[in-house]
């Protein structure tokens, strides 16, 4: 799997559609079309101050999935295919922000969810560049961009949307934060040297200004 495909952060549903299409569909045109469709659906709904209901905005995640999902198995080796992941991030973040604003989700809660997502994606990108991609089970458990959008859209049909935002933020925070912390605790930084600071401080030993060892008073 190429790095660009990892950056897409596809979930089980998108991956299933990609396998069905067999990697034959070019990803960029369909992703751009998905972004345009999301913009149109958000422009005509949801209506501010109302609960999510059978209006165009609730179907935006499904439309994006059907447009961008089948291209998920493509190798993404085209000259401009690197644009696909940031477009998907814009679709997901924009949808959650607009939906949260229209459904009276507290602004701090919207920011918390978006921050957790940003950290989740940053961690995946950084680890991929260091040659330590997140495990497959973590990527699947993270639901993918399509799973998170579908969850927030349809969870609002059963309960107030703030609960869905809070639940998703907590779930992703525990999943991504816990697994990432455990991974770095085991391996340390790629290419670096792990230092036991507790041991060094207890010994009171450090490096002098010229590289020699010196004893702290």
Language model segments and positions:
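Hydrophobic alpha-helical transmembrane segments
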Residues: 1-70, 82, 86-128, 133-217
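Helix-to-loop junctions at the C-terminal end of transmembrane segments
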Residues: 72-78
